[in-house]
Amino acid sequence: MAAFIGSLPWCDVELNLASSCFQRTAIAFVNLLFLCIFYLFLIASCVSTHFIVRGRKKGWIFVAVAICCAITSFIFLGVGLNSLIHGGNDVTEISWVACFVEGIIWVSLAVSLLVNGSKWVNILVSVWWVSFALLDLVAKSGILLQGNGIRILDILTLPMSLLLLLCSWMNLRSSSAAAQDCSVTGLSDPLLTKNPRKESARLATAGFFSILSFSWMNPLLSLGFKKPLSPEDIPSVVPEDEAQLAYKKFSQAWDTLLGDESSTKERNLVFRAVVKVYFKENIFIAVFAFLRTFAVVSLPLMLYVFVDYANSDHRDLRNGFFNLACLVMLKLVESLTMRHWYFASRRSGMRIRSALMVAAYKKQLKLSSLGRKRHSSGEIVNYIAVDAYRMGEFLWWFHSGWSLSLQLLLSTAVLFGVVGAGAFPGLILLLLCGLLNLPFAKMLQNCQTQFMIAQDKRLRSTSEILNSMKVIKLQSWEDEFKKKIESCRDDEFTWLAKAQLTKAFGSFLYWMSPTIVSSVVFLGCALLKSAPLNASTIFTVLATLRVMSEPVKIIPDAISAIIQGNVSFQRLNNFLLDDELKMDEIERSGLDASGTAVDIQVGNFGWEPETKIPTLRNIHLEIKHGQKVAVCGPVGAGKSSLLHAVLGEIPKVSGTVKVFGSIAYVSQTSWIQSGTIRDNILYGKPMESRRYNAAIKACALDKDMNGFGHGDLTEIGQRGINLSGGQKQRIQLARAVYADADVYLLDDPFSAVDAHTAGVLFHKCVEDSLKEKTVILVTHQVEFLSEVDQILVMEEGTITQSGKYEELLMMGTAFQQLVNAHNDAVTVLPLASNESLGDLRKEGKDREIRNMTVVEKIEEEIEKTDIPGVQLTQEEEKESGYVGMKPFLDYIGVSRGWCLLWSSVLGQVGFVVFQAASTYWLAFAIGIPKITNTMLIGVYSIISTLSAGFVYARAITTAHLGLKASKAFFSGFTNAVFKAPMLFFDSTPVGRILTRASSDLNVLDYDVPFAFIFVVAPAVELTAALLIMTYVTWQVIIIALLALAATKVVQDYYLASARELIRINGTTKAPVMNYAAETSLGVVTIRAFGTAERFFKNYLNLVDADAVLFFLSNAAMEWVILRIETLQNVTLFTCALLLILIPKGYIAPGLVGLSLSYALTLTQTQVFLTRWYCTLSNSIISVERIKQYMNIPEEPPAIIDDKRPPSSWPSNGTIHLQELKIRYRPNAPLVLKGISCTFREGTRVGVVGRTGSGKSTLISALFRLVEPASGCILIDGIDISKIGLKDLRMKLSIIPQEPTLFRGCIRTNLDPLGVYSDDEIWKALEKCQLKTTISNLPNKLDSSVSDEGENWSVGQRQLFCLGRVLLKRNKILVLDEATASIDSATDAIIQRIIREEFADCTVITVAHRVPTVIDSDMVMVLSFGDLVEYNEPSKLMETDSYFSKLVAEYWASCRGNSSQNLQL
């Protein structure tokens, strides 16, 4: 029987890795571990069918091998049973136990061969089979080499091992085929058919060995080495990593948890949903992490064995080679498992990140008005850019946390096994060091939470300011708003500094704890005499403590990262649980047979649920299909809220709302997406040329198209910032017309266009193109009211009157007041006495015909000039290829941190020198009998303590270097952005700037400073290790230098592609954030058109485009590290081989331990160096991107000391335009073509002209938002181009075309600089008709203003802007379409206020309403950038002037109302 099964006594001898006992026990342990994991999944499959794949049968080879395994199992079990019954009484004889264990393992192998599992189960069992076979073959080879007897069963099972290798290869091939089958399922179909799918990453089709070695990355890296990678070279994400699939799984889990009442009581449903979806795949990641931990902890034992072998009197080369083979195996397991653990955890993290980003985006599409008030656009972008993005690394930190904790425990066991009770004092000290991490972890948690709160506040303010930069520049508020951003950053920086200094002290503890603990352990050994202080013991202890130091250092960081993740989970949870729009509050259905289009009965609606008085009260409304309904009323009456009630956007308090048919919505504030004009009009619908051209003409856009360099394919900036207000409004209207909806909700669509264009839009668009549609039109243009079917008059949230035009006139009251106000404005228009209304209409028609001829001629002239077109939005710039040391030098140079950098480097050099000296002392002293243990430990402790000062200096100087750089770069970046010309903001989407202000700055804050020193530290340590190894065995330097050279080649090969991947990734992040920000601003329009699903699918594509670069970057990193580990392992194995081959006595055992201890750290140090060098190379791209914006060309200085105007300037307000020519870009055509005229002091000048004639450009030139190409502007004799911008803009007042309010309160919106008293503010409010409204609010001047003033109507926002200029009281006032969004009555009041308050001022009024400028002293008429006319309006009216034709056309548009009301 002994010959059959062998004898397995207890291991009662000294530790020997070559012993049969140890080998069989280790193999059994590994197999039992795999067995347990396998059965866990088998049990899980009984509950869920996810892991058992039906429909795919195993091949006959698997069945045959399974039968053989089962037979082998029965043999082992039978032999074991026989041994148990007939064995001897010796308790040390346990062969029957070994047989039973072997029998269980073999029968489990049989089961695993027959089970059809998912991809991950197949990988698990394949790894098990390969591990079993290789370990079995190595063990039996070792027995044969040692000359020991081999069991008969070992011979019988040898072919089984080879068959298991074959099965593992076949199993992995079948898994790859299954993955390819999955790639053609519906989930992989392109989401947007117009964008065909690229070839996916080669991982989807890679074989087992290609996956194992990351060789599937070779084609991409080879391409990147030959040329800089471009976005076209990047493959698409593999189907199983797509954002759609990730979100689908998350959404299902989320819905399940929401439906479970017990789950909703839990604090964080987002975390639970993530665990529910990704728990199972992370078990496999945990297996990799466990195997790596097991291999790392075993390495100190290998050191013990090698030193013991070198000190042995009877050295057997077979044992030496076996020890070397074990070392190779352990390093191989460590390397492969670590690389795949890192890659798999980040890949899983990427899926979580994609799922949460998409979930946050989907949520904002469903967020209620209250939810949108609680979560600003900037905050939503932050949830995506920071919180969800952080999940890409969360799983890596999580697995690091538990696996390093396990590593600490196993290392403790090894330490006790080597030195016994002597380890106890050291472990107590190590425990104390660990406990010290707890307060640090709490401090870091608090710092991180507060940092993120401060960061949210800063990014929200930054987003708001960037979106309103034009107003800020016009008002010269840059300094004040920059201080606001800097104040937010100061709060953020305070917590950043605390966090970084806390981490610096934690870093000090990490580096010092092994040194201090080792001294205490040696002291314990000496006092307790638990182990001799020889070379084996000392260097095994040092190696073990080095293994233990990694957890001590990283566990606090892991805790910090997990805490950060928990904070992000909580923030996302709060967001995803917020109120959603209640779609059941309105009933939506197809066209009704009764002909009803909109029906509201007893409707009460309120923006604020806690408000006792609803915003809209007792609304009764029934509109038939095809009716044209106008809604009018004073500012703040609730007109826009009524449209929101129809859309379901305003919370319903009571009543019913029914809408029959599809809806198209045109918002009062234009919402334009980044992209082409055509894309904005088509809005995702297929191109139908006939319908498209009809929509263009109906919205009077056909003439504008020729003004754009690329026609309707011209790229426009974010929110259409580089289009005029009229162009944006007409594009928005064309979008609605092209949509071919049933019900049209138009919110004051004509406010931003001139009277002629408004007439064209009303007649050609509303009356002709939409003649069979239902239209609800909110308007202040009274001239169109007589041509609608029904008019609703609103006051204070109620419909006070309803009926046809004539009926309402007869009723009088509110409607009569509106009409009278309009008539008062119209009747001031001077008419020649011999003109009748009929003549006027005829003149208007004749003028229109002549005007069209003029326009056509001008267009022909434009076409003949053949000026090259210029895209309004520029493609994001990025560096290409290797840029050398410039970004690194920029980082140090901008922060002026050379002194701190060299202090850090010298601190690290001093630390490494003293550490090497301390270990060399141990190696040297243990061979000298005269040196006592006290002296040995004492000198070691003194030298080690000296190194403490250096490592502390390094940690503190590094932290201060990072903080100094963060402050310098933020300051430079902020200054550059605020000083950038307006052209920069016109051509740069806000998302690009926000990406630099958020994720790039975050990298600069946290990653770059420590990356610098973490490159220096391992470089110094690597040098020290090679010097020591060369000192002991000089021959190793040959291999070491070759390995280093090869490492450099591989590293450079990798970096050529990695740099471009990171750069491209930098350009893919911004669209993701930009798209989310745009969606947040236009969510009402998106929901109204019913295009939320299309936007959602577009966003999925953007997320995938970003995710694939994260995926490839991580895969490339693992590719390079695996190869570098292999190269450095060659150096390690060479060193070990030399130590085996060198005769005994040639090298002292202490030096053997010293050399091998440094050799064991060689791979880790090189990997650490490579990883941090690559991390620094990648992170420095964020520095490069921020520095890129720090070099933006500046606009002229705010103040020029030697050119400052007198404090009383301008005392008169006279403006001279001298041959003024303006173009926006060097290659663009002239927008103003040599204008010359004079605005006399105290005059009121009206500026009129068609949309796009150059009116707004003239105002931009006056405020120097754009500099003249030639010519100049003189104010009171001073050339404004010669003085500072602040001196100019502070002396000018403007009410802009788009009224802008900022988040805060009423007081700060009226007086951002805080220079006026409350009395002055109240007086200004009274004059601008807002005092009554605000005095009724609970908080008066401190009442809140939400993002972009959304809780105030557009008209009220315009009145706030009027209040600002009333406070400033400058000598020159500009009104840029200032009354376009208010009713005629309020317009008349404002004009009266301006006449009274600015009687002695020069007032420049740009207007579309002729009555607004008709009482001006002078009128300037512009056409296509030329000054057509400039004279008194009365004189212009006496001739056949361009202005008289504009008046005539305004009369023509008002003909219905004018004829009726002039008779009243």
Swiss-Prot record:
One example GO MF annotation: ATPase-coupled transmembrane transporter activity
Any single Gene Ontology cellular-component annotation: cytosol
Matches recorded under SUPFAM superfamilies: ABC transporter transmembrane region, P-loop containing nucleoside triphosphate hydrolases
Membrane topology value: Multi-pass membrane protein
Domain ABC transmembrane type-1: 282-564, 901-1178
Cross-referenced Gene3D superfamilies: ABC transporter type 1, transmembrane domain, P-loop containing nucleotide triphosphate hydrolases
Expression (tissue specificity): Ubiquitous.
Broadest EC class assigned to this enzyme: translocase
Listed InterPro entries: AAA+_ATPase, ABC1_TM_dom, ABC1_TM_sf, ABC_transporter-like_ATP-bd, ABC_transporter-like_CS, ABC_transporter_C-like, ABCC_6TM_D1, ABCC_6TM_D2
Catalysed reactions listed for this entry: ATP + H2O + xenobioticSide 1 = ADP + phosphate + xenobioticSide 2
Amino-acid positions noted as binding ATP 2 in the UniProt annotation, renumbered to this chain: G1249, R1250, T1251, G1252, S1253, G1254, K1255, S1256
Domain ABC transporter intervals: 600-821, 1215-1449
Stretches that traverse the bilayer: 27-47, 61-81, 94-114, 123-143, 152-172, 203-223, 283-303, 321-343, 391-411, 413-433, 508-528, 909-929, 931-951, 1008-1028, 1030-1050, 1132-1152
EC number: 7.6.2.2
Cellular location(s): Membrane
Binding positions (ATP 1): G633, P634, V635, G636, A637, G638, K639, S640
Signal sequence range: 1-22
Keywords noted in UniProt: ATP-binding, Membrane, Nucleotide-binding, Repeat, Signal, Translocase, Transmembrane, Transmembrane helix, Transport
Main function: Pump for glutathione S-conjugates.
Family of this protein: Belongs to the ABC transporter superfamily. ABCC family. Conjugate transporter (TC 3.A.1.208) subfamily.
Protein name per its UniProtKB record: ABC transporter C family member 8
Record lineage: Eukaryota, Viridiplantae, Streptophyta, Embryophyta, Tracheophyta
